[in-house]
Amino acid sequence: DYDSEGLILLTNNGETSRKLELPSTGWLRKYKVRVHGFVDNKKLDKLKNGIKLDSFRTGPIDANLEIQKGTNAWVSIGLREGKNREVRRIMDYLGYPVNRLIRISYGPFQLGNLQKGETAEINKDVVSNQLGLMNKLK
């Protein structure tokens, strides 16, 4: 998503890439989302059991209002799948257009203090272990 920022995992290993995409890892993907509007916690609570979006049903979504500043609010979102533009579609469904989207974690991998444009290499053994590929990565 061109208008998103934050953590992105890059690899040139096809098996690793595929494994990272699958919801079967059970990994929680966390986002900080700035939306336009006055956020109602009751609306966010509707996401706990998943919702019907277009042609699919989402899994459970953890959503919490972090701070309301004027007509914008920061919401934290946690989900275990990653369909195309899913966070934006979820917030649109609730009536809150997204004006900033930052992925802060992807399973065990955290954005931490990395600044925009910075990179950090993850040891292949760590990735292999986290994905259950045990010594398969070269």
Residue ranges of model-derived segments:
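Basic, flexible Lys/Arg- and Gly-enriched helix-loop patches that mediate nucleic-acid binding at interfaces
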Residues: 1-138
